[in-house]
Amino acid sequence: MITLVHRCALAVLLLGASTWAHAQTLTVSAAASLGDAMKAIAPLFEAQHPGVTLRFNLAASGVLLQQLAAGAPVDVLATADEDTLDRAAAQKLIDPATRRVLATNALVLVAPAGSGLAGLDALTGPSVKRIALGKSASVPAGRYAQQALESRGQWSALQPKLVPADNVRQVLDYVARGEVEAGFVYATDAASAAGKVRVVATVGGHAPIRYPVAVVSTSAQPALARAFVQFLASPAAQAVLKQQGFGAP
């Protein structure tokens, strides 16, 4: 079911469609954790394609899929997990021939900068009352965190402490503001908030974190969309992703 918030986001995309049609604007729906990297890559691509403007729609991967399924005018879809793009492919929402992995990442446990949290085992202790993580239904980082906690036998015991978030950046904000004692985010997100949060531990026990990307099957400008997907594999784009802390595909 698409919530009111998701409908509003979709409406914004639809209302702008007629305007974008008169300019060469490429709309890229990307996982929230890719936001900083995509914005840094944009001017590099635009410099090679005069007259082209990249527009980014950033949200949790599951929300992006819902928007696309509801008819959002999108050209490229980049998610934070393979499963979401698999579902997009099953619904024939993407061109499978254009699919590729653009980057990898790691899951980390973070705490406020001044916290004395010692590790994952400390999450069950009395000093930790709130733990933020993405909603597993729509946020891949939340699913990775659940897999990790299940593999450690902590998932059930920690249920009363869990604070669900709409995306991984919201988790980061909760931790940075000290509203929770801990949270699960990507290593790249933690690096972007250095000084406000600290990495307590790198988390294992989950599926590999890969970021796949593909051209949307209903793109109004598929050639340009393919060019952008190909550009993401270029040395220039990969250098930006590496600088942002992402791993190689």
Where are these regions (language model features)?
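Bacterial N-terminal signal peptides that target proteins for export
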Residues: M1-V12, T19-W20
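Short, linear, compositionally biased motifs with a strong N-terminal bias
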Residues: L14-L15, D83
